[in-house]
């Protein structure tokens, strides 16, 4: 996999770093750690929305050198929380995020994959929390979807599984896997260690803004590293051929 983003000594006040790492094209990277670990701060920095110490290079150029409009064509970012902007149909909100607004078939396909096919005519300010979360997810997927955006490269997601039930989480995993196979790099924060163990290629484990471990998920999710991050003992079990972590305390 080719390197897409390089972080070197990235830091922000007392909330983050300094930390260094790389993101490769076509990989799923999970940011994990307890609340206050710096995951949201790091994602916002990687999205180019904040500045601070250290440097980030994206696509071979300094992140701060990218024009805002051009950057939005290459990367999409889902904030942890966002209220509906104002009353508009779901289909209209999604269209605003499409590089090619004539691709109605693609809009319908992504909406169907996330269980939104029957909600396209609803107003965004009349949706439940889970419905609005899926609309937001569909929007950022459409923004960088390679079928309509040949320069889409990176998808940054801050706790995308919030408000989603098990079936909806599974549907999102399928969408992300499809994007990954198409070469899109996906960086997302997660609180579900077993989900990360099952679906991520790599993981960065953080605590209080510091990077405890990074690498392949199996290398990061060791009892020693997890104890450092969470202050708990963990056991790793094998359940029907799949590894599973449980707290041992």
Curated annotation (Swiss-Prot):
It is found in: Cell inner membrane. Belongs to the ABC transporter superfamily. Vitamin B12 importer (TC 3.A.1.13.1) family. Its main location: membrane. Residues 1-233 form the ABC transporter domain. GO terms for cellular component: plasma membrane. Gene3D superfamilies: P-loop containing nucleotide triphosphate hydrolases. It comes from the Bacteria. HAMAP family: BtuD. It is a peripheral membrane protein. This is Vitamin B12 import ATP-binding protein BtuD. ATP binds at residues 33-40. GO terms for molecular function: ABC-type vitamin B12 transporter activity; ATP binding; ATP hydrolysis activity. Keywords: ATP-binding, Cell inner membrane, Cell membrane, Membrane, Nucleotide-binding, Translocase, Transport. It comes from Salmonella paratyphi A (strain AKU_12601). The complex is composed of two ATP-binding proteins (BtuD), two transmembrane proteins (BtuC) and a solute-binding protein (BtuF). Part of the ABC transporter complex BtuCDF involved in vitamin B12 import. Responsible for energy coupling to the transport system. Its EC number is 7.6.2.8. It catalyses: an R-cob(III)alamin(out) + ATP + H2O = an R-cob(III)alamin(in) + ADP + phosphate + H(+).
